[in-house]
């Protein structure tokens, strides 16, 4: 609770400060920003957009967002209370100590991601912790429907690796996952669901290599509610090898489902919040904007950070509407929210949907 109270206070203070300040810094290229310290990030942004993301919400943008979470969530006040080192949160340790942390089971595949981003970080002039969170925000700005995220600089880089066991796994049960988020930042069950909005623009690469880059929903390049709709559909078959721990049956050909997502979508503590994101895009954007900021401040003193949010591009608008994939109807839904009926949605016309893998950049 203390962390979230501090975050709320800092957010209000920043908003009040921004409203009262009329003078803005002018960067060497003529761009005006709220803080002069952020001018150097303009070149970093452009380098990432032009040479890594190609201004697209593709594989590299997805991985950049994944990296922000796997770095930041590795913090445990409960471990600290017992005299153990509990990790530093958003401190860049997953890149600084990549030889250790990318060997942790939940970080499988991130060794290649870290190395692909390392040259960008090295020429950016940014600290590693700041770079990881900034690159995730820049990449997500390419996703239609995403909110304009916040970007802050001034974090302290890690001096030791985070301990293993702090990143949730797809085979963990709901109680374990909720406890992990609560320990990391006093996040409750609803806020845990907010983190999973990131799965709207995501795919798996290494859980089942037989179907590498299989997305979690039918619109992986768009941050919309389809992930929340489609995870509530009845699974009918494994799209890959089958029998892999943490993998559930999928409702749509080509779509990958994590067991953890399936269970959280159906748990009575989280099901109604989950269902709400299927049709409420404004809420989805608002909650993800908040939780991304909160995540990026784990392990930091937010009062020491500099707001560089105005460096970030504005995401493209959403052009899709909530729907069932072709071949799916309301009869395929496994409703789990006792408070609100599952919404009535149109079904896409044509033959049954088959979802393509996310193209490799």
Curated annotation (Swiss-Prot):
GO biological process terms on file: cellular response to oxidative stress; hydrogen peroxide catabolic process; lignin catabolic process; response to reactive oxygen species
Gene Ontology MF terms: diarylpropane peroxidase activity; heme binding; metal ion binding
Binding site for Ca(2+) 1: 71, 89, 91, 93
Site description Transition state stabilizer, residues in chain: 66
Binding residue positions for Ca(2+) 2: 200, 217, 219, 222, 224
UniProt keywords, alphabetically: Calcium, Glycoprotein, Heme, Hydrogen peroxide, Iron, Lignin degradation, Metal-binding, Oxidoreductase, Peroxidase, Signal
Annotated spans, Disordered: 341-361
EC primary class: oxidoreductase
Residue sites binding heme b per the record: 199
Keyword Lipoprotein on entry: no
Chemical reaction(s) catalysed: 1-(3,4-dimethoxyphenyl)-2-(2-methoxyphenoxy)propane-1,3-diol + H2O2 = 3,4-dimethoxybenzaldehyde + guaiacol + glycolaldehyde + H2O; 2 (3,4-dimethoxyphenyl)methanol + H2O2 = 2 (3,4-dimethoxyphenyl)methanol radical + 2 H2O
Glycan attachment sites: 268
Leader sequence residues: 1-20
Pfam families for the chain: peroxidase, Peroxidase_ext
Annotated pathway: Secondary metabolite metabolism; lignin degradation
Catalytic residues (positions): 70 (proton acceptor)
Family, as annotated: Belongs to the peroxidase family. Ligninase subfamily.
Record-given protein name: Ligninase-3
């Amino acid at each position: 609770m203390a962390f979230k109270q501090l975050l709320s206070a800092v957010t209000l203070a920043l908003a009040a400060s921004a409203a009262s300040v009329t003078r803005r810094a002018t960067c060497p290229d003529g761009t005006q920003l709220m803080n002069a310290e952020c001018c150097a990030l303009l070149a970093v942004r452009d380098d990432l957009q032009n040479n890594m993301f190609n201004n697209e919400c593709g594989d590299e943008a997805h991985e950049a967002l994944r990296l922000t979470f796997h770095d930041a969530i590795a913090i445990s006040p409960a471990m600290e209370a017992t005299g153990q080192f509990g990790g530093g949160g958003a401190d860049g340790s997953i890149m600084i100590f990549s030889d250790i942390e990318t060997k942790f089971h939940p970080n499988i595949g991130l060794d290649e991601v870290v190395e692909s981003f390392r040259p960008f970080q090295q020429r950016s002039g940014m600290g590693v912790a700041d770079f990881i969170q900034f690159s995730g925000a820049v990449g997500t700005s390419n996703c239609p429907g995403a909110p304009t995220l916040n970007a802050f600089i001034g974090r302290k880089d890690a001096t030791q690796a985070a301990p293993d066991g702090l990143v949730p796994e797809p085979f963990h049960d709901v109680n374990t996952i909720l406890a992990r988020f609560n320990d990391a930042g006093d996040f409750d069950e609803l806020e845990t669901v907010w983190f999973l909005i990131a799965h709207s623009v995501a795919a798996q690469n290494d859980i089942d290599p037989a179907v590498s880059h299989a997305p979690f929903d039918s619109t992986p390049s768009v941050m919309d509610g389809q992930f929340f709709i489609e995870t509530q559909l009845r699974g009918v078959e494994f799209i890959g090898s089958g029998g892999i721990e943490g993998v559930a049956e999928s409702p749509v050909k080509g779509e990958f489902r994590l067991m953890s997502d399936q269970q959280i979508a159906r748990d009575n503590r989280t099901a109604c919040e989950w269902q709400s994101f299927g049709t409420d895009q404004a809420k989805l954007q608002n909650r993800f904007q908040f939780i991304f900021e909160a995540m990026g401040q784990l392990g930091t003193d937010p009062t020491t950070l500099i707001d560089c949010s105005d460096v970030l591009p504005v995401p493209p608008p959403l052009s899709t509407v909530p729907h069932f994939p072709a071949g799916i109807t309301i009869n395929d839904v496994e409703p789990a929210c006792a408070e609100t009926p599952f919404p009535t949605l149109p079904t896409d016309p044509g033959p049954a949907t088959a979802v393509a893998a996310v193209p490799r950049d």
